[in-house]
Amino acid sequence: MPPRKRKLEELKNEQGEQGSYKCHLCGQCFYRGCGLASHLRRHAPVTFDCEHCAYTCKHKYAYDRHLLQSHPELVESGPLVRMFKNEDEDAPMPILEREADVSDDAVKYEALSSFSEPEPISYKCPLCISTFGSHARAVYHILSHRVKLYQAPKSLKFFSRKTMQALGGFRLESQLMIKWRLQYDNRSVDEKRTRLWRYMEENFGHEHLKQPKLESDNPSTSSSFESQTNLNDSSIIKKKLVMKCGTVFGQRLIHDNTQYYLCRNCPYVSWNVSSLWRHFRHHIQKSKQSWTCIACSYSSSSRVKIDLHVKMHKEMPEIDLEFATWLRYERRINKNDLNKPTNKKKKPDGGNGSNHSDMRSLHAFLSLKNSKNNVVKHDIDAPTLHPLSPAPKLVAMTQFDFGEIVTYKSVNPLHQINKNNSNPTVLPNKRNSIKTSKSDTQIALSVKQSSSMKMVKVSPGKVYQLPKTSKFYRPESPDSLASNNSAHGDEIESTSSDQFQQSVKVPKYEDFLNMKPVMPYFQKQRHPLEAIAMYEKAKREYEKNHCFPNLPIFEFNIEYKNLHPLAKAQYGKNNMKEYFLNEMEVEKSRECTDCPFKHNDLQQFRLHRDKHFYGGSHTCPECNYSSNNHNQVVEHTFVDHYLSDVRLVEGLPSSDSEDDNIPVPPDTPQRKKKAPKRGKRRGW
């Protein structure tokens, strides 16, 4: 311990926590008298004012330091004397001034009218356009350029015994590894660093700057980039680290009283020699069972060490945040012993830097989303929403009077009529309409007569008029329909559509931002994020209710005998009672009206029918069957459409479910064979 510090410790032990020298103005205690004397200047009204700028201080050494740093050209040589002012002046305490020996022919400097701080010295990188205000940051940046000399090609990936071919790993003795080694720059590390070290010596104050430059040292370098530096205090000292056998395994770099140890074969940096020595052993000790780095001679039998080493060959980041992250990574590598076994569960980063756990969770989410449990029977809602449009001109519109029927685009091919059919019209599905010219028996077997498919003979000049019935429109909000029907069931039919239709207010952001305070002094506005969330929710509800179609609902139990098939199809969709009755008939028959599917199991049949009403991302090319599972749609197209055609031609049942109805003869019970009796053992 230094003597001054030891004496201070003795004073602290003698005087206790508080010193014996106490200031009578503020009560602060000091262990020494010099500390109290320096402290009393803070209470004195003495100030040192700079004549050339607005700088003011209370200590002489601070004033002299300011003159040397801020006004070096104005300071003249001369003895330092103590000048006393007259008693008439206000200053009661002496002021220190510098008396200059000025000759007659000396030029007097006038005070500066406007003072400006000198521009800070900028440190420019000789290898790129980066500029730094700190010398230490510039040194680290130049050191980061050396990893680019070892940057491996992007085509070569990491190493793994099990996934060597998938990730592109290479053995040390493989032909691809030898070929890449021969094509790689085979210069030594010292030769590769010649350009970098020469620029560091020129710009950061090495002794090599005074020596003449030799073109043979580095013929490929150029001096087009120069840095403006002015360093007097800090410098960089390098020293080679040599083994007993004469092999150079690294360099010691000293900067700002901090030692750094650099490996001569890779970008490894350490703060102690022992870590560098343990690291360099992986460069010289090789075996056939070891894995090697594709950018240097580093090898190890542990794949985890190889993966950690490959990360150091990546290009150095340039921003301050990533630079600090790199420093923490280097310190963590040096702190941990490389020979210490690491966690085997830790997996290396993939070639594209993706996280495997995130990919697994995403895959599980997608599989869960695609394979969600199907409900046995869904509630049948309104038909598929389409924009209201006039009926397609499939026939002459003057022949029919559709009455109050509102038409919309029908997705079901059963509701489409062929233009060329002027004879009695039949509405088969798309698959059977193609085979009309082949065989009449196939049409008779495949097409089923239903309520929506009847033969209607069209005669020109005859008009089909719907009976006059009162109508009402469904409100835009379906939730309000139940309460109105229960209380005013008779009055709804007499009201008009304009009176019954509710007016929906368009949501505005200002309505949710401003609120009525509970108390007078409470806040009158919500948080913008909360207001935006409420506005978006109201907007979605508005769009959902506003786009709900106003479909007419007719009275029930009305029979329309002479009704056009197109109008009847529209009427059946809008009349929910008849729609449910038709669906019940379809379920009783166990035969799908949109495709040739048949199944005796009601649960399986309902699951199939739901695919026709609830759309998916994949659609069958033969009908409106859709699902989010592509394989399910392909199986439906092949089994229900293509195989059913083959069964019809060959005279086989059109569905596998019909095979289940064939009684299976009971198996005749077989008699159990008697086990043979074991004979008695003979005596020995």
From Swiss-Prot:
<keyword id="KW-0863">Zinc-finger</keyword>
<feature type="region of interest" description="Disordered">
    <location>
        <begin position="469"/>
        <end position="501"/>
    </location>
</feature>
<keyword id="KW-0804">Transcription</keyword>
<keyword id="KW-0677">Repeat</keyword>
<dbReference type="GO" id="GO:0005634">
    <property type="term" value="C:nucleus"/>
</dbReference>
<feature type="region of interest" description="Disordered">
    <location>
        <begin position="652"/>
        <end position="684"/>
    </location>
</feature>
<feature type="region of interest" description="Disordered">
    <location>
        <begin position="419"/>
        <end position="440"/>
    </location>
</feature>
<feature type="zinc finger region" description="C2H2-type 4">
    <location>
        <begin position="261"/>
        <end position="283"/>
    </location>
</feature>
<feature type="region of interest" description="Disordered">
    <location>
        <begin position="337"/>
        <end position="359"/>
    </location>
</feature>
<keyword id="KW-0539">Nucleus</keyword>
<feature type="zinc finger region" description="C2H2-type 5">
    <location>
        <begin position="291"/>
        <end position="313"/>
    </location>
</feature>
<feature type="zinc finger region" description="C2H2-type 2">
    <location>
        <begin position="48"/>
        <end position="71"/>
    </location>
</feature>
<feature type="zinc finger region" description="C2H2-type 6">
    <location>
        <begin position="590"/>
        <end position="612"/>
    </location>
</feature>
<dbReference type="GO" id="GO:0045944">
    <property type="term" value="P:positive regulation of transcription by RNA polymerase II"/>
</dbReference>
<feature type="compositionally biased region" description="Basic residues">
    <location>
        <begin position="671"/>
        <end position="684"/>
    </location>
</feature>
<dbReference type="GO" id="GO:0008270">
    <property type="term" value="F:zinc ion binding"/>
</dbReference>
<keyword id="KW-0805">Transcription regulation</keyword>
<comment type="function">
    <text>Probable transcriptional regulator, which participates in the transcriptional repression of the presenilin protein hop-1.</text>
</comment>
<protein>
    <recommendedName>
        <fullName>Suppressor of presenilin protein 3</fullName>
    </recommendedName>
</protein>
<feature type="zinc finger region" description="C2H2-type 7">
    <location>
        <begin position="618"/>
        <end position="641"/>
    </location>
</feature>
<dbReference type="GO" id="GO:0003677">
    <property type="term" value="F:DNA binding"/>
</dbReference>
<feature type="zinc finger region" description="C2H2-type 3">
    <location>
        <begin position="123"/>
        <end position="145"/>
    </location>
</feature>
<feature type="zinc finger region" description="C2H2-type 1">
    <location>
        <begin position="21"/>
        <end position="43"/>
    </location>
</feature>
<keyword id="KW-0862">Zinc</keyword>
<dbReference type="InterPro" id="IPR050331">
    <property type="entry name" value="Zinc_finger"/>
</dbReference>
<keyword id="KW-0479">Metal-binding</keyword>
<keyword id="KW-0238">DNA-binding</keyword>
<keyword id="KW-0678">Repressor</keyword>
<dbReference type="InterPro" id="IPR013087">
    <property type="entry name" value="Znf_C2H2_type"/>
</dbReference>
